[in-house]
Amino acid sequence: MSTFHFDLVSPEMVAFSGDVDQVDIPGAEGDFGVLAGHAPVVAVIRPGILTVTAGANKQKIVVLGGIAEVSDKGLTVLADVATPAPDVDLQDFAATIQTMEQQIPGKVGDELDRAIERLDHFKSIQHELNTTAMH
């Protein structure tokens, strides 16, 4: 399988940089996978779990939004937050979700819709992290 260069950058750090076989991205308009030779594209990333495959190794990274750009040079993801899944504190993540739930009643209209959508994404991440932690 052909490889391509992938960089994952957040304001705090370069979370990943190297050659990979595939990257699966939680896109705002649907999840998508990138392989070598992918057509150029710029996409918005929603909160979710990004999966990097390099040979037999798979690495899951929690991203909380950002932008992905595929070019002839490879894939660059500029993430608002990027944390390797094993490094996520599940109790802190659950507390964040609880705070988000408590803030829902004070929102209306589009703000309410966005808050519910973001909460749903966080709950999906939590479910996958809890499922992965059990295996």
Curated annotation (Swiss-Prot):
Principal subcellular localisation of the protein: membrane
Pfam families associated with the record: ATP-synt_DE_N
Keywords, comma-separated and alphabetical: ATP synthesis, Cell inner membrane, Cell membrane, CF(1), Hydrogen ion transport, Ion transport, Membrane, Transport
Topology term for the membrane: Peripheral membrane protein
Function: Produces ATP from ADP in the presence of a proton gradient across the membrane.
HAMAP family for this protein: ATP_synth_epsil_bac
The protein's name in its UniProt record: ATP synthase epsilon chain
Record organism: Rhodopseudomonas palustris (strain TIE-1)
Gene: atpC
